[in-house]
A protein has these predicted regions:
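Active-site palm subdomain of RNA-directed nucleic acid polymerases
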Residues: 19-47
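Conserved structured core elements
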Residues: 5, 9-20, 41-44, 68-71, ...
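C-terminal polymerase-core module
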Residues: 51-178
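Residue-identity detector for threonine
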Residues: 12-13, 33-36, 47, 67, ...
Length: 178
């Protein structure tokens, strides 16, 4: 008696609108900045996340730097360019939707140099910086894969974790040897 399907659909639809709105705005901004046309820089979207590829931008501007330098460049771009752009974009959405006030907030979570998606909510990310904290050594973030499921035997989980290190940091030959 407290559940109304119309309210649930309204909440779901407004969430989808807001995340797609920002994905489109980010794609348009990066296409304009990099002088590309209809290139999709958004790798994936989730209910509350946008996974964005800055590879082309980083290679164009900071391609001569090492990985640490590239991560620092991405961190600066996220803080100085993307965050204000996202805030402004959500303000535009609030005005477009005639909202009472703008309540959408999106912050950068991780910066990575490598990632693998197998399906929705199933991925591996080689994280160098998480919410502004720079790691001395990258940490592997795993979501939804067998290596983080409790139903997978511990021995298998450990071997899968080890294989990830080879996949992310080794060569194809190293993986075949493993």
């Amino acid at each position: 008696r407290y559940f109304d399907i119309r309210m649930a659909e309204g909440i779901t639809t407004s969430g989808q609108l807001s995340i797609r709105w920002m994905a489109n705005k980010l794609n348009n901004m990066l296409n304009k900045t990099l002088k590309t046309q209809d290139k999709d820089f958004v790798i994936a979207i989730d209910t509350d996340s946008i996974y964005l590829s800055l590879e082309e931008l980083v290679e164009k501007v900071a391609g001569d730097k090492d990985t640490v330098g590239k991560i620092k460049y991405m961190d600066r771009i996220c803080e100085e360019v993307l965050q204000p752009f996202i805030d402004q974009g959500y303000q535009e959405l609030a005005e477009y939707m005639n909202a009472y006030s703008q309540k959408m907030i999106m912050k950068r979570e991780v910066l990575a140099d490598k990632a693998i998606w197998t399906a929705k909510k199933r991925y591996v990310i080689n994280v160098h910086n998480s919410e502004g904290v720079q790691f001395a050594k990258p940490k592997v973030k795993v979501m939804g894969l067998e290596m983080v499921k409790s139903s997978t035997p511990a021995v298998i989980r450990d071997k899968l974790h080890d294989s990830l290190q080879v996949i992310l940091h080794g060569s194809e030959k190293d993986l075949h040897k493993y």
